[in-house]
Amino acid sequence: MRQYHNLMKEVLAKGVQKSDRTGTGTISVFGHQMRFNLADGFPMVTTKKLHMKSIVYELLWFLKGSTDNNWLKERGVSIWNEWAAPDGDLGPIYGYQWRSWPAPNGQHIDQISEVVETIKKNPDSRRIIVSAWNVADIPRMALAPCHAFFQFYVADGKLSCQLYQRSADIFLGVPFNIASYALLTHMVAQQCNLEVGDFIWTGGDCHLYSNHLEQVDLQLSRDFLPLPKLNILRKPDSLFDYEFEDFEIVGYESHPHIKAPVAI
C-alpha cells in the first residue's frame, strides 16, 4: 500500500505542528486522498500486522446499530474500551446514526437500508450517502465521528465507495478504517449483485501523533508485501445477516505488529 506510505511521508515532510484535544501533539496536513482499486487486492497494510478480527467485528457491530461495547468485549475486541461508560454505553455513535438517525417526527431513519435499496433501484443517484455526523447528538457521543460521511457510486456494474474522514490518526486509525470500508464495499456489492470498483479515502486533518514518530520510521523502513484477497463465503439474505465466519482473508503476509499508544 504505497499510497499509505506516501501519506506518512507527506506529513513528515510538509506537516505543521498542532496541539490537539488529547494533549499529545501532532504533525498535521489538511486534505489528502488515496484511491484503491479493490480488484487489485484487499487493502490491508503489510508493513505491520493488522488485527482483522477487530475490523470485522466492529463493522458487524456498526451494522447491527449497536452502541454497546459489551457486545465487542464478549467477542474479544477491546478497541472501544477506553471510551465506554462502565455499563458499556458509548452514546449515539456510528451504529446508532447509521441505522436509527432520529427524524423530526419522532421516527428513525435506517440510512444503511435506504442506501442498499437506492443502489438496487436507482444506481445513478448522487444521494447514496450515509452520515454519522449528527450535530445535535455529538455532545452525547463518547467520541465524535472521525470517519464521518461516505458515499457509494455505481458505474459499469461496479460499486465504488468514498469515505470522508474529518480526523485521521494516520498510524493507528487509518489502516483500520481503510480495511473496514473496503470490507463494507465488498459486502454491499455482493448484496446488490455488483462487482467492486474503487475505495477512495479522503482525509481532512491528517495527523501523526508526536509519540508515534519512531513507529512510523520503523514502518517506512519495511518493504511492501503482496496484498491479500478477500473471500466472502456465502451470500446472506441481507446486509445485516453476515457473521464473522463468512469472511476469509487469503494470503495475508505482513511484517510484525508495531505497538503504539492510543491518544484518548
From Swiss-Prot:
GO terms under biological process: dTMP biosynthetic process; dTTP biosynthetic process; methylation
Known EC number: 2.1.1.45
Enzyme's top EC category: transferase
Residues that coordinate or bind dUMP: R21, R126, R127, R166, S167, A168, D169, N177, H207, L208, Y209
Binding-site list for (6R)-5,10-methylene-5,6,7,8-tetrahydrofolate: H51, D169, A263
NCBIfam families: PRK01827.1-3 (NF002497), PRK01827.1-5 (NF002499), thym_sym (TIGR03284)
SUPFAM superfamilies xrefs: Thymidylate synthase/dCMP hydroxymethylase
Localisation per UniProt entry: Cytoplasm
Keyword NADP belongs to the record: no
GO MF annotation, one: thymidylate synthase activity
Family to which the UniProt record says this protein belongs: Belongs to the thymidylate synthase family. Bacterial-type ThyA subfamily.
Biochemical pathway: Pyrimidine metabolism; dTTP biosynthesis
Name of this chain's protein: Thymidylate synthase
Cellular component terms (Gene Ontology): cytosol
Catalytic activity: dUMP + (6R)-5,10-methylene-5,6,7,8-tetrahydrofolate = 7,8-dihydrofolate + dTMP
Protein species of origin: Polynucleobacter asymbioticus (strain DSM 18221 / CIP 109841 / QLW-P1DMWA-1) (Polynucleobacter necessarius subsp. asymbioticus)
Catalytic residues (UniProt): C146
Role, per record: Catalyzes the reductive methylation of 2'-deoxyuridine-5'-monophosphate (dUMP) to 2'-deoxythymidine-5'-monophosphate (dTMP) while utilizing 5,10-methylenetetrahydrofolate (mTHF) as the methyl donor and reductant in the reaction, yielding dihydrofolate (DHF) as a by-product. This enzymatic reaction provides an intracellular de novo source of dTMP, an essential precursor for DNA biosynthesis.
Subunit field text: Homodimer.
PANTHER family hit by this protein: THYMIDYLATE SYNTHASE, THYMIDYLATE SYNTHASE 1
Gene: thyA
Key words, A-Z: Cytoplasm, Methyltransferase, Nucleotide biosynthesis, Transferase
A matching Pfam family: Thymidylat_synt
InterPro entries listed in its UniProt record: Thymidate_synth/dCMP_Mease, Thymidate_synth/dCMP_Mease_dom, Thymidate_synth/dCMP_Mease_sf, Thymidylate_synthase, Thymidylate_synthase_AS
